[in-house]
Regions:
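An N-terminal hydrophobic leader/cap segment in hydrolases
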Residues: 1-44, 57
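Conserved HGGG/HGGXW glycine-rich cap/lid loop of the alpha/beta-hydrolase fold
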Residues: 49-115, 133-136, 140, 153
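Active-site loop/oxyanion-hole signature of alpha/beta-hydrolase fold enzymes
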Residues: 60-61, 107-166, 180, 186, ...
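The conserved beta1-alpha1 loop
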Residues: 76-80, 148, 288
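Flexible "cap/lid" loop of the alpha/beta hydrolase fold
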Residues: 164-215
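Conserved alpha/beta-hydrolase catalytic His-Asp/Glu region
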Residues: 209-278
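Conserved serine/cysteine hydrolase catalytic core
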Residues: 257-305, 314
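Catalytic active-site module of serine/aspartate enzymes centered on a nucleophile-bearing elbow/loop
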Residues: 301, 305-379
């Protein structure tokens, strides 16, 4: 029998905890991943990378719904590091039902988008990519920009590069589980000592791993317990279905190691504080999970300190990928953000003069479902 390593034992323990914790979750809580957009297109960036873009038109029954300040904005959802547009699937559906046109896309080197030259894997380039996507999919009219993790960095970088577009067209911004930089993000919640090792060795280690794709793919197939342990630790802070853990693991481990390695140094050294200033006067939601190990609350607090009038929402029992862990709650916060922004425009409210607000919210419905399911499983 092969001896069990300490990490293997820990992985097994985490997986068993996941199994027990998810016993109370109904199968209906497993997201329906298949989604048919109204339109799928390819947008080519300035340097020739093909980005996979999907557009959802509002449901016909919602098109006549009245929106404050006139025309309903297009909502653009931007995913994070080592994920794909799929992580926004539940918000896409909900926003469409509420009468919004939605644009999502896979960032360069992720999902169904093309692989770029590795030297272009920078946050500044992602900001330029977002500008290109906007120019093709919604060249006029109001927009709401929502970014998760590296997607939030993309939005901030775009704002710094295109302040005039922000001033003229951006109705609202959602920055979810993200960071302005300056926090040694590649510590990944490991602590200062271990984190410094990861921060210094991570990109090189990933690059070396990418040269041995065959063995790594074998590990991917055989190491499900380890994958589950990694995802459970860094993605979530409350019980989720095993299927959700599997799907997030698939997104992460399907991302090219070369691409991961190329982005990490730029993420670790970036400073987006000057870019954030361009969002002054824009209704902004800054949201993070209380148990986020990748971008803890201190990252969000730094953004809020720079941005007058921002609303800071902390979600209890939530990890880094909060929009999949607590989808209904995140959707509700996005709808509230858009409503606040539309009301501010209609009433002539100066957003920058509003007081900063910090709220802590909890997904009560999920807790109730978990308790109810646990009782049913025990009976």
């Amino acid at each position: 029998m092969t001896p069990l390593t300490p990490f293997g034992a820990a992985a097994g323990a985490v997986t068993e905890r996941l199994r027990r914790a998810s016993t109370g979750l109904r199968t209906s809580e497993e997201p329906r991943w298949a989604h048919v957009p109204s339109e799928s297109i390819t947008v080519t960036t300035e340097d020739g990378v093909a980005l996979h873009v999907e557009i959802d038109a509002p449901e016909s029954a919602s098109r006549g719904r009245r929106h404050l300040a006139g025309r309903a904005p297009t909502v653009v959802l931007v995913h994070g590091f080592a994920l794909t547009m799929e992580c926004w699937v539940l918000q896409r559906r909900a926003l469409v039902r509420h009468g919004f046109r939605v644009v999502t896309y896979d960032q360069r080197g992720h999902g169904r988008s093309g692989l770029p030259d590795l030297e272009t894997c920078t946050i500044a380039q992602l900001g330029r990519d977002l500008d290109t996507v906007l120019g093709v999919t919604c060249p006029s009219g109001p927009v709401v920009l929502v970014g998760h993790s590296m997607g939030g960095m993309t939005v901030m970088s775009f704002a710094g590069q295109h302040p005039e577009t922000v001033r003229d067209r951006v109705l609202a911004v959602g920055l979810v589980s993200t960071s302005p930089g300056g926090h040694d993000i590649t510590e990944l919640g490991l602590g200062s000592v271990a984190g410094r090792v990861v921060g210094s060795l991570g990109p090189g280690v990933l690059t070396r791993l990418s040269r041995h794709a065959g063995p790594i793919n074998v590990i991917r197939r055989m190491g499900k317990n380890i994958q589950d342990a990694v995802v459970a630790r860094w993605a979530f802070d409350s019980p989720v279905s095993p299927g959700l853990v599997d799907r997030v693991a698939e997104m992460i481990f399907a991302t090219s190691f070369d691409v991961m390695a190329a982005f990490l140094p730029d993420i670790d050294s970036m400073d987006l504080a000057p870019d954030i200033v361009a969002l002054t006067g824009v209704e902004t939601l800054v949201l993070n999970g209380s148990g986020d190990l990748v971008t803890p609350a201190s990252h969000s607090e730094q953004i809020v300190r720079i941005l007058p009038g921002a609303e800071h929402v902390v979600v209890e029992d939530a990890g880094h990928i909060v929009m999949l862990e607590h989808p209904e709650l995140v959707t509700e916060q996005l709808l509230m953000l858009i409503a606040r922004a539309q009301r501010a425009v209609a009433e002539g409210v100066a957003v920058a003069s509003k007081p900063r607000v910090r709220r802590t919210v909890q997904d009560i419905s999920k807790k109730r479902r978990g308790r109810r399911g646990g009782r049913e499983a025990a009976s």
